[in-house]
From Swiss-Prot:
Residues 240-255 have a biased composition (Acidic residues). Belongs to the U2 small nuclear ribonucleoprotein A family. The gene is SNRPA1. Identified in the spliceosome B complex. Identified in the spliceosome C complex. Found in a pre-mRNA splicing complex with SFRS4, SFRS5, SNRNP70, SNRPA1, SRRM1 and SRRM2. Found in a pre-mRNA exonic splicing enhancer (ESE) complex with SNRNP70, SNRPA1, SRRM1 and TRA2B. Contributes to the binding of stem loop IV of U2 snRNA with SNRPB2. The modification N6-acetyllysine is found at residue 172. Its main location: nucleus. Changing residue 68 to K: No change in spliceosome assembly. Transmembrane segments: none annotated. The lineage of its organism: Eukaryota, Metazoa, Chordata, Craniata, Vertebrata. PROSITE patterns: LRR. Keywords: Acetylation, Isopeptide bond, Leucine-rich repeat, mRNA processing, mRNA splicing, Nucleus, Phosphoprotein, Repeat, Ribonucleoprotein, RNA-binding, Spliceosome, Ubl conjugation. InterPro entries: Leu-rich_rpt, LRR_dom_sf, RU2A, U2A'_phosphoprotein32A_C. Residues 174-201, 222-255 are annotated as: Disordered. This is U2 small nuclear ribonucleoprotein A'.
Length: 255
């Protein structure tokens, strides 16, 4: 594992990404802890922490400029409190393929008032009953969850399910948090799927080349790594078209 030092930050790749944001690439260093980001001098719109060994999402200084945080393919099982104080303008958070287990572990995301684009795909918590409705209720500012637009019908269903004393009790009952944090403990892993055919790989690469947002690029890369093909992956939310979120012209999900 590699300690995230000021020297590493200075040496890491820095570039203007596909959506013209200034990005810091800290991908694949096997970093275990987020620290020393004050060395960035708040000069980046996006930071890529993909493919590291991070277990807890915290340790950020005040980064007013940061809008996009990619933390897929880590080992995150906890989300720190008070992220809104450090990341007031965060709009996109990609937590795909981590180790979040309990619905209550997602509660700290509610404080991120600018968060509109969130992915928690391939975390054990997504298998919990009422997962999607719980996140929609607890983090109502999110407009796109797991790469699916939040529908007005879903918001109404979430409000109905969790409102009032009975709803509050239901939310409390299903939202327990992980009680222990053991750095050496084993974490859930997904079974490996068969790889895609060469034609499928080429289709995904073409889709990546035509992607219009950084989050979409990361989703397609994740599909390529897991052997899934765009349009064939299992949907984690409702499959009906439903009525889309009202006030669509106010949505700012990075596209």
């Amino acid at each position: 594992m590699v300690k995230l030092t000021a020297e590493l930050i200075e040496q890491a790749a820095q570039y203007t990404n596909a959506v013209r944001d200034r990005e810091l690439d800290l991908r694949g260093y096997k970093i275990p802890v987020i620290e020393n980001l004050g060395a960035t001098l708040d000069q980046f719109d996006a930071i890529d922490f993909s493919d590291n060994e991070i277990r807890k999402l915290d340790g950020f200084p005040l980064l007013r400029r940061l809008k996009t945080l990619l933390v897929n393919n880590n080992r995150i099982c906890r989300i720190g409190e008070g992220l809104d104080q450090a990341l007031p303008c965060l709009t996109e958070l990609i937590l795909t393929n981590n180790s979040l287990v309990e619905l209550g572990d997602l509660d700290p995301l509610a404080s991120l008032k600018s968060l509109t684009y969130l992915s928690i795909l391939r975390n054990p918590v997504t298998n919990k009953k009422h997962y999607r409705l719980y996140v929609i209720y607890k983090v109502p500012q999110v407009r796109v969850l797991d790469f699916q637009k939040v529908k007005l019908k879903e918001r109404q269903e979430a409000e109905k399910m969790f409102k009032g004393k009975r709803g509050a009790q239901l939310a409390k009952d299903i939202a327990r948090r992980s009680k222990t944090f053991n750095p050496g403990a084993g974490l859930p892993t997904d079974k490996k799927k068969g790889g895609p055919s060469p034609g499928d790989v080429e289709a995904i690469k073409n889709a990546i080349a035509n992607a219009s947002t950084l989050a979409e690029v990361e989703r397609l890369k994740g599909l390529l790594q897991s052997g899934q093909i765009p349009g064939r992956e299992r949907r984690s939310g409702p499959t009906d078209d439903g009525e889309e979120e009202m006030e669509e012209d106010t949505v700012t999900n990075g596209s």
